[in-house]
Swiss-Prot record:
Domain (HTH APSES-type) ranges: 37-143
Lineage: Eukaryota, Fungi, Dikarya, Basidiomycota, Agaricomycotina
Function: Transcription factor that positively regulates ergosterol biosynthesis and thereby affects polyene and azole drug susceptibility. Plays a role in maintenance of membrane stability and osmotic stress response. Involved in genotoxic and oxidative stress responses. Also promotes production of melanin and capsule and thereby is required for full virulence.
Protein name per its UniProtKB record: Transcription factor MBS1
Effects seen without this gene: Exhibits increased susceptibility to flucytosine. Also leads to hypersusceptibility to SDS. Reduces LAC1 induction mediated by nutrient starvation and leads to weakly reduced melanin production. Expression is significantly reduced by nutrient starvation.
InterPro entries: Ankyrin_rpt (IPR002110), Ankyrin_rpt-contain_sf (IPR036770), HTH_APSES_sf (IPR036887), KilA/APSES_HTH (IPR018004), SWI6-like (IPR051642), Tscrpt_reg_HTH_APSES-type (IPR003163)
ANK repeats: 348-377, 467-496
GO biological process per UniProt: melanin biosynthetic process; steroid metabolic process
Alphabetized UniProt keyword annotations: ANK repeat, DNA-binding, Lipid metabolism, Melanin biosynthesis, Nucleus, Repeat, Steroid metabolism, Sterol metabolism, Stress response, Transcription, Transcription regulation, Virulence
Biased composition (Polar residues): 166-176, 757-774
Main subcellular localisation: nucleus
Induction: Expression is regulated in response to flucytosine in a TCO2/HOG1-dependent manner. Basal expression is positively regulates by HOB1.
Originating species: Cryptococcus neoformans var. grubii serotype A (strain H99 / ATCC 208821 / CBS 10515 / FGSC 9487)
Gene Ontology CC annotation, any one: MBF transcription complex
Length: 774
């Protein structure tokens, strides 16, 4: 197993490095004519191209259509503004939208008349006149210089040195004349008689004539289709006046040169989704047949089988990814002992894990990880497989990203050569039209997984790349509100500024201003722009309205509306502040009330705790009083029974005549036995009188019992009570001690009322003027 590529890490963070998208490549043939270039792109469409203000402006040769997107770039519109102008004005008329493929060729194409009007409307007609007014002639343009190609990766060169297999590759530098190209075409036509036509012949013939040109990343981040795949019709340079027919030739041993060089360079450009491989598969369908073991068998005459080794492993794996076969190569299912899963399989340094992650093939990812593939391995740009997986929409289309992220999540904190994190690449995906949903899907998956690790998330979510950009600033430039909201909800800082001294907050406000009131350009048109200033941003503000009436409506009317809305906002804000103050005062009063209630509750609790022993004593006193009453009643009852028995005995003695000596007692008994005279009524009246007297005596007896019990309860405190009576009498002045008990209730009520008045006056003094207390 080869060494794992070196990694760069965030400070204090293990396993960290992050990557930038590799620049797209395109096979083209360029001929200079004055300041114009005649260009063939991977689609085979010839165009005239002129660089103006660092923008490649194109005009198709076949129908003279102009690229409206490029015209707006020259006019100084940024991406959000271009999108709005295209939707409002350009796309309502005749137009053709080109998406996919080489980045510069993409955009909205319009007839030359509409393109001229658009250039005039936004003040760039003069500087675009050369490409608009150019008339093709029969004179052949001078030969174009060859475009240099980035050398193969270091790992690839080292492997070639070790195996001693040095490939013979055509020269990548130096001019090539048209005559030389014609001679090469004649040589190819001569070879046609000795070979069988094959769809892959364009690989060899085109490799001998045309070089790859890496496109600067600033122009487009959209990967191109495999650039080396060209049809016969694509290769007919007769369309350029070169009279060069490119026939097919048989794929022979020269395929060894092409397969390891051109094919790997072209295959290194990953597709945004697998459907973009269709053109490659249709051309390569007959040139490579997959055996049950996943090894390509090239069709040719008398080709001896080659030994299988590490060099062939990379070819087999790469062929698997760029073909439509669904059978996984056997070297991935059962890896040989000399199989290195971290070996790069193309000239951009991508490993098999990079390809599998980018294409959303989770099963292959698991096989590679089992074989020892490193999730921290980086390509030439130090991009990790996780970064490559979020640069395309394949994982979104197949809804495989959560499962894939669980396998790769330990590389979340990695950074690449541009100091970009995986969040930068997700936000960068949102810049591509139609990819916002995929970017949101990736972002929400990662943020949900990292929500339990806020410290680590805070370290990486606000990380700045070499341009000072954070993921939030890129998302704000992409005008993706969902991405912006997701990042803000998880702690992204909108005030971090990039090298242009602009923050995400600035981009958001700029977008809102653009939506509400676009800034028109002055009526005076555009001044001359010097050559040195051509590379800088235009010094004028682009016009968004063609007519004067539209400019007036979009100017003064919007200003008046804005002024009224601001006045309404200020009025509403002032009223809201007043309401807020009232609410604060009410809350303060409520807090005071709650405080008083709490304090009173505590006082009641304290008094209750203090009175608890008194309650026990009260119960004890009541128990003693009840016991005393019972004893007194029992004593009285016993005395009554004794008296009654004595009376009965005395009456019995009287009847027996034993009271002879005691006349007084005898007279008393006789009086009791005498019946009143006067009839029955007198007797009943006498009985009623006696009953009443008995009842009165009983009540009086009960009263005396109560007094006796109270006297017993107050026993020992009578002297103290007497002193209290004297003290109260002296305080009242003129009230005798005997009247104190009768006035006690009135005195108590007066004291309670006076206490209540003092409490009220105290609270009023705290919340109002002192005169209220007085």
């Amino acid at each position: 197993m080869g060494p794992i590529p070196s990694t760069r890490r965030l400070t204090g963070t293990p396993h960290s490095f992050i990557s930038r998208r590799a620049p797209p490549e395109c096979m083209w043939y360029v001929c200079m004519f004055a300041n114009l270039e005649i260009t063939f792109y991977d689609s085979g469409v010839p165009v005239y191209e002129m660089v103006c203000r660092d923008v490649a402006v194109m005009r198709r040769r076949s129908d003279a259509y102009l690229n409206a997107t490029q015209i707006l770039k020259v006019a100084g519109f940024d991406k959000p503004q271009r999108t709005r102008v295209l939707e409002r004005e350009v796309q309502k008329g005749e137009h053709e939208k080109v998406q996919g493929g080489y980045g510069k060729y993409q955009g909205t194409w319009i007839p030359i008349e509409r393109g001229l009007a658009l250039a005039k409307q936004y003040g760039v007609e003069d500087i675009l006149r050369p490409i608009i007014d150019y008339v093709p002639t029969s004179v052949s343009p001078p030969p174009a210089p060859k475009h240099s190609v980035a050398p193969p990766s270091k790992a690839r060169r080292d492997k070639e040195k070790e195996t001693g297999r040095t490939k013979a590759t055509p020269s990548r530098t130096g001019p090539t004349s048209a005559a030389a190209l014609q001679a090469q075409a004649q040589l190819n036509r001569a070879k046609m008689h000795d070979s069988t036509p094959d769809a892959d012949a364009s690989f060899r013939s085109f490799e001998e004539r045309v070089s790859l040109t890496p496109e600067d990343d600033s122009s487009s981040d959209t990967p191109s289709p495999v650039a080396s795949v060209m049809t016969d019709q694509d290769m007919e340079v007769d369309k350029m006046g070169m009279h060069m027919n490119m026939p097919n030739v048989t794929l022979s041993q020269n395929m060894e040169e092409l397969g390891a060089g051109s094919r790997k360079r072209s295959a290194a450009m990953m597709m945004e989704d697998e459907d973009q491989f269709g053109h490659l598969r249709s051309v390569r369908g007959n040139s490579a047949v997959h055996t049950p073991h996943g090894t390509p068998r090239h069709l040719g005459i008398g080709m001896p089988p080659e030994p299988i080794g590490p060099e062939q492993y990379t070819d087999i794996i790469l062929n698997y990814f760029v073909s439509e076969t669904s059978q996984i190569p056997s070297i991935l299912v059962s890896p040989p002992h000399d199989f290195d899963p971290n070996a790069p399989i193309d000239d951009d340094g991508h490993t098999a894990l990079h390809w599998a992650c980018a294409m959303g093939r989770v099963r292959v990812v698991k096989l590679l990880l089992t074989a020892g593939a490193s999730i921290f391995a980086g390509n030439n740009a130090e991009q990790t497989p996780l970064m490559r997986s979020v640069m395309f929409s394949n994982n979104y289309d197949m809804r495989k990203f959560p499962e894939l992220y669980e396998l790769l999540h330990r590389s979340t904190l990695n950074i690449d050569k541009q100091n970009r994190t995986v969040f930068h690449h997700i936000a960068n995906l949102a810049l591509t039209k139609g990819k916002t949903h995929a970017a949101k899907y990736y972002m929400e998956t990662i943020l949900a997984r990292l929500a339990d690790y806020p410290q680590e998330l805070a370290d990486v979510i606000n990380f700045q790349d070499e341009e000072g950009e954070t993921a939030l600033t890129i998302a704000a430039r992409a005008r993706s509100r969902r991405l912006v909201k997701a990042l803000l909800d998880h702690g992204a800082n909108p005030k971090i500024k990039n090298r242009d001294s602009r923050s995400a907050e600035d981009y958001i406000l700029e977008d809102e201003r653009f939506r509400s009131s676009p800034v028109p350009a002055p009526n005076g048109g555009v001044g001359k722009v010097s050559t040195s200033a051509a590379a800088e941003k235009p010094i004028f503000a682009p016009q968004l309205y063609f007519s004067e009436a539209a400019r007036l409506c979009g100017g003064q009317a919007l200003t008046d509306i804005t002024s009224h809305m601001q006045s309404l906002a200020r009025s509403f804000d002032a009223e809201l502040q007043g309401k807020e103050r009232d609410i604060l005062q009410a809350k303060a009063l409520l807090t005071n009330i709650h405080t008083e209630v709490t304090e009173n509750g505590r006082s009641i609790t304290a008094i209750t705790n203090q009175a608890a022993p008194l309650e026990e004593k009260r119960h004890e006193l009541e128990s003693l009083q009840a016991s005393l009453k019972t004893k007194v009643k029992d004593a009285l009852k016993k005395g009554y029974i004794g008296w009654l028995e004595g009376e009965l005995i005395r009456e019995q003695r009287w009847e027996k005549g034993e009271l002879e000596g005691n006349e007084e007692e005898k007279a008393a008994v006789q009086a009791l036995r005498d019946v009143p005279t006067g009839g029955q009524e007198v007797v009943q009246a006498e009985e009623e009188k006696l009953r009443w007297e008995i009842e009165e005596k009983r009540k009086r007896r009960a009263m005396f019992v109560e007094k006796f019990v109270r006297a017993q309860a107050e026993a020992g405190t009578s002297e103290q009570i007497a002193k209290y009576r004297k003290l109260v009498s002296a305080g009242l002045g003129g009230v005798s001690t005997n009247e104190v008990d009768e006035l006690m209730n009135q005195l108590l009520e007066g004291l309670e009322e006076e206490n209540d008045n003092q409490v009220y006056n105290t609270s009023a003094g705290e919340s109002g003027p002192s005169s209220w207390v007085q």
